[in-house]
Amino acid sequence: MTEQILFRNVMKITEGSLEPFREAVRQAIEFVERNGPQIMVRTFIDEQEMRAVSFQLYRNCEDVLRHWEISDPHIRAVSKHCSVEKFEVYGNPSDEVAAGLSQFLSGGRGQIMNPLAGFTRF
């Protein structure tokens, strides 16, 4: 059974990198809107606290892997201007997806929340 996967990524923007971060995020989102498999991507910013939060909703784990495959240059461009403070996964990631996220899930920065109940309506 394939289940939706939702990511919530809290990022601390590097001092002096607000504008480059904003531009890298805009370019990344424009790219995935045209080419990516995500159902939804939304990024929010708190300029005073120099933090951003990104939500990404995928149909399944295969779409997560596809996103990583085609979007790596954009992911790297955004990552040059921030660090991940917290990464939450909502759903049941495959072993391959969990392995790809392991750097964010260790050290108390991340967690996986298993589904209990719900639905999606678009």
Per-region residue spans from a language model:
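A short, acidic, amphipathic alpha-helical segment used as a generic capping/interface helix at domain edges
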Residues: 72-76
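Short S/T/G/P-rich N-terminal loop/turn motif that feeds into the first structured element of a domain
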Residues: 1-52, 59-70, 80-122
